[in-house]
């Protein structure tokens, strides 16, 4: 499985647990592939080329916010710093949360990719300037969240409940989730009945999904 197809497949993971069993997996995959060619591929490249350090994900949050709003989500910004919370209410049912982390790492990219990051940024935590890259796959995560938003919005007849999409800051520093909780995340937006997160992994064979409860 190529990296391109792996990203598409991972995007489908978010959807598979929420869509009705009547939805065709083949149709869903075709829809995701079409969206990747038309929009998500360029969005991924943009996120990869423009990474931001923990607590400084300003541009990333703005771009993800615009994507989610364009698909009909009500988005609140500045939650726990640069965090965002997007809600779509769709009748009675559970509140389901999907989370994607947004921050890059203070590393210089040497991939040789035509869209490799050349970014540098002042780290608000240390006060030092670092090269920045998406070395942990968060560019894949937020692109997949944007793709999930579109697929779920277009399939509202296939599910019922409330969908909460979260763009989490500062995951790499183990700070962002706590910051959002201190900002009264559950009290303001509701406590999820189910919460889902995913992460790409270089330690797993391509095409393999490892599911853990926690």
Predicted regions and their residues:
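Bacterial N-terminal signal peptides that target proteins for export
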Residues: 1-10
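Sec/Tat signal peptide C-region and signal peptidase I cleavage site
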Residues: 21-25
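Histidine/acidic-residue-rich, glycine-tolerant segments that coordinate divalent metal ions
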Residues: 122-133, 139-140, 157-214
């Amino acid at each position: 499985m190529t990296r391109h197809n792996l990203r598409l497949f991972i995007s489908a993971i978010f959807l598979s647990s929420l869509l009705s069993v009547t939805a065709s997996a083949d149709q869903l995959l075709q829809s995701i592939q079409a969206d990747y060619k038309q929009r998500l591929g360029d969005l991924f490249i943009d996120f990869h080329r423009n990474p931001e350090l923990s607590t400084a994900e300003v541009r990333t949050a703005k771009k993800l916010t615009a994507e989610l709003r364009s698909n009909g989500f009500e988005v609140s910004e500045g939650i726990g710093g640069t965090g965002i919370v997007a809600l779509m209410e769709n009748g009675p049912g559970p509140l389901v949360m999907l989370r994607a982390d947004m921050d890059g790492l203070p590393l210089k990219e040497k991939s040789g990719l035509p869209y490799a990051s050349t970014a540098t940024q002042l780290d608000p935590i240390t006060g030092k300037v670092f090269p920045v890259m998406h070395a942990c796959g968060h560019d894949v995560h937020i692109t997949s969240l944007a793709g999930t938003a579109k697929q779920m919005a277009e399939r509202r007849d296939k599910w019922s409940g409330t969908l909460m999409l979260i763009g989490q800051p500062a995951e790499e520093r183990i700070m962002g989730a706590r910051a959002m909780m201190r900002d009264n995340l559950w009290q303001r937006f509701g406590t999820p009945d189910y919460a889902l997160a995913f992460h790409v992994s270089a330690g797993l064979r391509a095409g393999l999904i490892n599911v853990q409860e926690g």
